Curated annotation (Swiss-Prot):
Motif window: Iron-binding motif: 203-206
Protein name per UniProt: PPE family protein PPE37
The keyword Metal-binding is assigned to this record: yes
Organism in which the protein naturally occurs: Mycobacterium tuberculosis (strain ATCC 25618 / H37Rv)
Biological process according to GO: response to host immune response; response to host iron concentration
Family: Belongs to the mycobacterial PPE family.
Gene3D superfamilies: PPE superfamily
Length: 473
């Protein structure tokens, strides 16, 4: 309240304020506390200075000792400054207490004011025919004097209190004693977001209070400052802090996951998992198969004929055997008691590539079918005898055979044009049937290596040459 405002207040109001208040006792107690704090600051600063001097004079020498002394020097200066501030605050409280005492002494008392009112009432009551006009005027003038005196005293007391508060310096925060590396390591941890928000809110309110005091002098600025002080104290209180943590913590920690709880936005959050459909599982083991079908081309010239011996001498027939189209294993002339002798196989394939030992039933069935094909054309007993001998041969065979390699995706065989298996003989037409044909005398192409078809441990012997090549060339 400024000086003109105190003249609008009756003297009874400020007199009652000063007379019924706490008096100068709390201000003097605060001044004594500030003096004690200043003495403690001074004592600690003196002790720290003696410790630093002892460190420099002791056996601890070197860069670490120098860093210790240098790190504590700002703190010692701060202790000295804090002692000065505490002394100034104590003096300010003493000045405010003195101003209060002076204001209380210069303020018209409530008894004087009450006596003036009583005198004025008596004079007015006994004022017959205007005999008390002058005493009443004097009484009113005295009351006006007390009014002006109360306003003047309160204005002076307000000025003294304001100057005392403004003259009190503020204490800065204590400097850090640890090194910058330790400070950065200590501050590297992520702060509490709710605490940070509360601190920002208090800083904003304090900024508003500072602007209100500086830009709005007078009653309006004081009113806004008091309201902001109440808000700052409420924000700093435990109730608002509890409510802030209760509201802000779920929003901070669980707010980013809120779209996942919505049935409308959940498909949009799971669209990133759609690419997992293109990821295939581990591939299964590769199963190697051995095809029973041989290559489509002829790998070795067919035998010129097969001699079949039966139980009936009249049924003995010598005919040239047609070259098989699917098997490259020709049959040799048979002897009594056996359908055919085991011949040579033309085995083709890439260098260094072995044959899979799991070629069991499929390869065996192909060879048996090719061996039994000519016997199927024989009449009667020869066909049965050949079939039974082929069966016995199949039983005696082992579970490993040399067979043609098929295209399994790892090897691509060169394609060669197919050639006719038989051609017309040069002797003319003798008898109808297979007797008038002979194997084609055209040279065959070398497609592999010759190999004996007997033992499992046989190795490749010599390269296969066309039958028209002379060994002397």
């Amino acid at each position: 309240m400024t000086f003109p405002m105190w003249f609008a207040v009756p003297p009874e109001v400020p007199s009652a304020w000063l007379s019924t208040g706490m008096g100068p006792g709390p201000l003097l107690a605060a001044a004594r506390a500030w003096h004690a704090l200043a003495a403690q600051y001074t004592e600690i600063a003196t002790e720290l200075a003696s410790v630093l001097a002892a460190v420099q004079a002791s056996s601890w020498q070197g860069p670490s000792a120098d860093r210790f002394v240098v790190a504590h020097q700002p703190f010692r200066y701060w202790l000295t400054h804090a002692a000065t501030v505490a002394t100034a605050a104590a003096a300010a409280h003493e000045t405010a207490a003195a101003g209060y005492t002076s204001a209380l002494g210069g303020m018209p008392t409530l008894a004087e004011l009450a006596a003036n009112h009583a005198m004025h009432g008596a004079l007015v009551t006994t004022n017959f025919f205007g005999v008390n006009t002058i005493p009443i005027a004097l009484n009113e003038a005295d009351y006006l004097r007390m009014w002006i005196q109360a306003a003047t005293v309160m204005s002076h007391y307000q000025a003294v209190a304001h100057e005392s508060v403004a003259a009190t310096p503020s204490t800065p925060p204590a400097p850090q004693i640890v090194t910058s590396a330790a400070s950065s390591a200590a501050s590297s941890s992520f702060p509490d977001p709710t605490k940070l928000i509360l601190q920002l809110l208090k800083d904003f309110l304090e900024l508003l209070r500072y602007l209100a005091v500086e830009l709005l002098p007078g009653p309006l600025g004081d009113l806004i400052a008091q309201v902001l002080d109440w808000f700052i104290s409420f924000v700093s209180g435990p109730v608002f802090t509890f409510l802030a943590y209760l509201v802000l913590d779920p929003l901070i920690y669980f707010g980013p996951f809120a779209p996942l709880t919505s049935p409308v936005l959940l498909p949009a959050g799971l669209t990133g998992l759609a690419g997992l459909g293109a990821v295939s599982g581990p591939a299964g083991p590769m199963v190697e198969r051995v095809h029973s079908d041989g290559p489509s081309r002829q790998s070795w010239p067919a035998a010129t004929g097969v001699t079949l011996v039966g139980t009936n001498p009249a049924a003995l027939v010598t005919t040239p055997a047609p070259a098989p189209t699917t098997s490259a294993a020709p049959t040799a002339p048979s002897t009594p008691g056996s359908s055919a002798a085991q011949g040579l196989y033309a085995v083709g394939g890439p260098d260094g590539e072995g044959f899979n030992p799991i070629a069991k039933t499929t390869a065996l069935a192909g060879v048996t079918t090719d061996a039994a094909a000519p016997a199927a054309k024989l009449p009667g007993d020869q066909a049965q005898s050949s079939a039974s001998k082929a069966t016995r041969l199949r039983r005696r065979l082992r579970q490993h055979r040399f067979e043609f390699l098929a295209d399994d995706g790892r090897l691509t065989m060169p394609n060669t044009p197919e050639m006719a298996d038989v051609a017309a003989g040069n002797r003319g037409l003798d008898a109808l049937g297979f007797a008038g044909t002979i194997p084609k005398s055209a040279p065959g192409s070398a497609t592999g290596l010759t190999h004996l078809g007997g033992g499992f441990a046989d190795v490749l012997s010599q390269p296969m040459l066309p039958h028209t090549w002379d060994g002397s060339d």
